[in-house]
Amino acid sequence: MTSNRSNLLFSLVLFHFLFVPTQLQALNTDGVLLLTFKYSILTDPLSVLRNWNYDDATPCLWTGVTCTELGKPNTPDMFRVTSLVLPNKHLLGSITPDLFSIPYLRILDLSSNFFNGSLPDSVFNATELQSISLGSNNLSGDLPKSVNSVTNLQLLNLSANAFTGEIPLNISLLKNLTVVSLSKNTFSGDIPSGFEAAQILDLSSNLLNGSLPKDLGGKSLHYLNLSHNKVLGEISPNFAEKFPANATVDLSFNNLTGPIPSSLSLLNQKAESFSGNQELCGKPLKILCSIPSTLSNPPNISETTSPAIAVKPRSTAPINPLTEKPNQTGKSKLKPSTIAAITVADIVGLAFIGLLVLYVYQVRKRRRYPESSKFSFFKFCLEKNEAKKSKPSTTEVTVPESPEAKTTCGSCIILTGGRYDETSTSESDVENQQTVQAFTRTDGGQLKQSSQTQLVTVDGETRLDLDTLLKASAYILGTTGTGIVYKAVLENGTAFAVRRIETESCAAAKPKEFEREVRAIAKLRHPNLVRIRGFCWGDDEKLLISDYVPNGSLLCFFTATKASSSSSSSSSLQNPLTFEARLKIARGMARGLSYINEKKQVHGNIKPNNILLNAENEPIITDLGLDRLMTPARESHTTGPTSSSPYQPPEWSTSLKPNPKWDVYSFGVILLELLTSKVFSVDHDIDQFSNLSDSAAEENGRFLRLIDGAIRSDVARHEDAAMACFRLGIECVSSLPQKRPSMKELVQVLEKICVLV
C-alpha cells in the first residue's frame, strides 16, 4: 500500500516537472509577442487582458485575439495569430514594436483607447497587414516613411490623434488601399497625389496646405473630404474628372480661389461642400464668377464717326436724289413735342408706380414690426431711492417681489435665452419690494401703448398681444449685463418669463434678423428645453418671451446645499434632493443636450444657473442660442463663458467654434457636482476625482468619502448605480475631447442606470 502511494506521488511530481515546461513551450512566438504588448499597458480598468498569461496552451483564446490554422497539424505553430481587436477598452500605454513582428497579423484594431507616444518604425513591417485602425487615441509624432512592405494594406485609420509632419508619399502609392482616414490630426505640407484605389479618403481637419493635386483619387472614389485645411489656389480643371458622378466631395473651409470646374462630380455637390472659401465662385455656389470684358471697336468704323451712325445699317438700294421728295421722310416722323410728352408721361408713370410700391411696403413693414416705435417697457430701476427721481413723463409703481424669488441664493430664477450671473439681486438688496418704472400713463390712468408697437409670437400656439402683456403684474427675477429678467403674470394667472435686451446688446440690426434667429431657436422643441413664445422689437429695447419655470435653478440648489453643509444645523436645506431625484435631473439634462446635438447645434454654455427645475424637478435647459441674439463683444464679457469657469472644457480658450464635446464636459462637471456637491476642476481635482485604486473596496471607500452627505444613505442602497454615475462623470471631464462619450451614449448609459434604482 505504501509502495503504491509512493509510486503515485512520484508520478505526480514527474508529471509536474514534465508537463509545466511543455506547457510553457506550447506558448508560441505569437503569444510571447502579445504578452510583451500586454506588459507595456499601464492601466487596464476593464481587465480585458486578465486572461493573457503564460499558462495558456495557446493565445487563441485570449480576449481580442483571433487565430487561423496556417501551420502543420499538431505543432505549436499550427494556429497563428491573425487578428487583434481591442477597441474602446480604455487601455492606457504605448504600442510596442514587437506587436508588428507577429508574422501573420492581418487585422489590428486598437481604436478609441488611450495609447500615447509615437508609432514604431516597425508598424508597416507586418507584410500580411490588411487593416490598421488606431483612431481616437493620443498618438503623436511623424508617421514612419517606410511603408512599402504593407502591400496588402486595405484600411488605414489614424484619425483623431495628434500626428504631425507630412503624409508619407508611399502611403498614397499603395495599390490595395481603399479606406484612408487621417482626419483630426495636425498633418501639414502638401496633399500627396495618388490614392488611385481609394474608395474613402478623409484628410479633413488638419493643417495641409499647398494646392490640390491634379491626379488625386481615381474611378473608385466615393467619398473625399479635404475640409478644414489650408489648401489654397485654384481648383484644376483636371481635378475630380475621374471621380464618379455620385461621389461625395467636401472642400469646405479652405483657401481655394477662382471658379469651380464643371466636372459632373463637382456640380452634383451641395453648396456646403465649397463653403468657407471666400474667393471661390461658380456652381453649385450662388456666387457668380466675374467675366472679363472683350469688347472692341467695330471694324471699318472711323474714329470720328458718330456711334449712332456707326451702328445704322447701310441700305443696299441706290438712292436717286432727283426722285426723292424732300418731305417724304419727314411725314413719317413724330414731332419733337410728341416725343417729349411721351417721355415725360413714362417717367411720371414709373415714378408713381415706384412710390406706390414703396408705400405699400412701408405700411406692411409698420404693421409687422414696430421699428419706429420707442416704448419704455419695464425699465427697472434697481436703486432703492434713486428710482424715485424719475422724469415727470413716467409714473413710478411698486410691485412686490416674486415669492419664488425669495430663495437662499436670491433672485436666481432664470429665463430661456437668459444667462444670469451668480451675482443676481439678493434678498437683502430688494427689501421685499422693488421699484419699477412703468409705462407712460394717459390722463385716464391706463397704460399707454404706441399704435405701432406689436408683439410677435413664434410658437404657433400662444395667443398673446401687447395690451395683455402691458397689464401683467411684473416681478423681478434677476439682472445681467445684457438686460433684466422678470416674471410677468397675466390677468388669467398665466406666467411668462421675459428678458429685456438693450439695443446696444442686440446683435441683430433689423427686425427680420432678430425674428429669424428667434424662430430658429423656437423650432427646437423638447421636454427638457424651455419654450420660446414670442418677442417684441423696439428701437431702444427688445423683449424675449418664454415659459416661466417655477422651481428655480440648479444654482439655487447647489448654493443651498453648500450653505447646509457649512452650517451646523440642517435648517438651511430642509428638503434636499434625493439620489433618485439627482439621477432624474442628470438623465433629463442628457436627453435635452442629446436632442440639441442631434439637431447639429451646440449649447456651449451649460452651467447650473442655466438648468431650471419645474414642479416635478425635471430639468429644463435654458440659454440656448442667446449668443446669436447678443453682440459678441457684450456677450463675451457678460453672459458668455469665461476662461475661469469650471464648467467650460480646457480647450475652450483655444477653440474658435463650439463643439458638442463642450456640452459633454459641462454635463460631466454638473453630474459630479450633483453627486459630491463639489465643483470639479481639471487643474486641481483631477487626482482626487479620477485617481481610483485598483482595489474595488478601496475605490468604493474613496467614492463614499467624496459623496454628498445628504445622499450618503441613498447611495448605500444603490451603490452600483452611484458608482456607475461617478465613473460616467469622470469620462465626461477627460481633458481630451475625443475621449469623452457622446451625449447620445450618455443617455443610453443613464437609462440603464435608472433601471437599477
From Swiss-Prot:
Name used for this protein in its record: Receptor protein kinase-like protein At4g34220
GO molecular function: ATP binding
Pfam families from the UniProt entry: LRR_1, LRRNT_2, Pkinase
Cellular component aspect of the GO annotation: plasma membrane
InterPro entries, sorted: Kinase-like_dom_sf (IPR011009), Leu-rich_rpt (IPR001611), LRR_dom_sf (IPR032675), LRR_N_plant-typ (IPR013210), PRK1-6/SRF4-like (IPR046959), Prot_kinase_dom (IPR000719)
Annotated Polar residues bias: 638-654
Mode of membrane association: Single-pass membrane protein
Keywords associated with the record: Leucine-rich repeat, Membrane, Phosphoprotein, Repeat, Signal, Transmembrane, Transmembrane helix
Subcellular compartments: Membrane
Originating organism: Arabidopsis thaliana
Positions bearing Phosphothreonine: T494, T638, T639
Main location group: membrane
Region (Disordered): 633-654
Similarity annotation: Belongs to the protein kinase superfamily.
CDD domains tied to this protein: STKc_IRAK
Domain comment quoted from the record: The protein kinase domain is predicted to be catalytically inactive.
SUPFAM superfamilies (alphabetical): L domain-like (SSF52058), Protein kinase-like (PK-like) (SSF56112)
Residues recorded as bearing Phosphoserine in the entry: S473, S553
Residue ranges occupied by any Protein kinase domain in the UniProt entry: 471-753
PROSITE patterns: PROTEIN_KINASE_DOM
LRR repeats: 104-126, 128-150, 152-174, 176-198, 199-219, 220-242, 245-267
